[in-house]
Design a protein with these regions (language model features):
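Short amphipathic alpha-helix adjacent to the substrate-entry channel of hydrolases
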Residues: 82-102
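Short beta-to-alpha linker loops that shape the active-site pocket of alpha/beta-hydrolase fold enzymes
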Residues: 103-107
Length: 155
């Protein structure tokens, strides 16, 4: 009889090809995910920060001099989709600050260091817009965290 661990591994390996599709097809599939919406008390805007498009989640009440710079995950090849927006909106509401989500250039169309250049441009743009470095909290998930660490090393 197989162990529980080997049964789990066999199950996971049998599903390994779920993401083995062309990137364009995966992107289209993600667009079809039904959004849960953003919480009340948060609005969403699009802004160009230093030439890079960003989704900005704005809490109805909060601090105007502090912000979160949040880099979404997605293997550097998937854009901002509903779960990212919803998470950023909840962060904005809970923390009471704007959350900036750069729509950084994606691979493979834009190879490294394109995403890093966009991340740095948004950070520098936030400084130019009056945020002090000490009032910007950087966050990320999955590959977004890798992008964040790369940006910190580049500073």
């Amino acid at each position: 009889m197989a162990s529980v661990q080997s049964a789990c591994i066999r199950f996971l390996l049998s599903r390994a090809n779920l993401w083995n599709k062309p990137i364009a097809e995966i992107r289209e599939s993600l667009k079809k995910v039904k959004p849960q919406g953003i919480p009340s008390g948060v609005s969403e805007e699009f802004a160009a920060i230093n030439g890079v498009g960003c989704k900005v989640m704005i809490p109805a009440e909060g601090l105007n001099n502090k912000a979160i710079l949040y880099f979404h995950g997605g293997g550097f090849c998937l854009g901002i989709y509903h779960p990212n927006r919803e998470f950023a909106a909840r962060m904005a509401k809970k923390c009471g600050v704007k959350v900036f989500m750069p729509n950084y250039r994606l691979a493979p169309e834009n190879p490294f260091p394109a995403a890093l250049e966009d991340a740095m441009a948004v950070y520098k743009g936030m400084l130019l817009e009056g945020y002090s470095a000490g009032n910007i909290v950087a966050a990320g998930d999955s590959s977004g965290c890798g992008l964040l660490l790369s940006a910190l090393l580049a500073l």
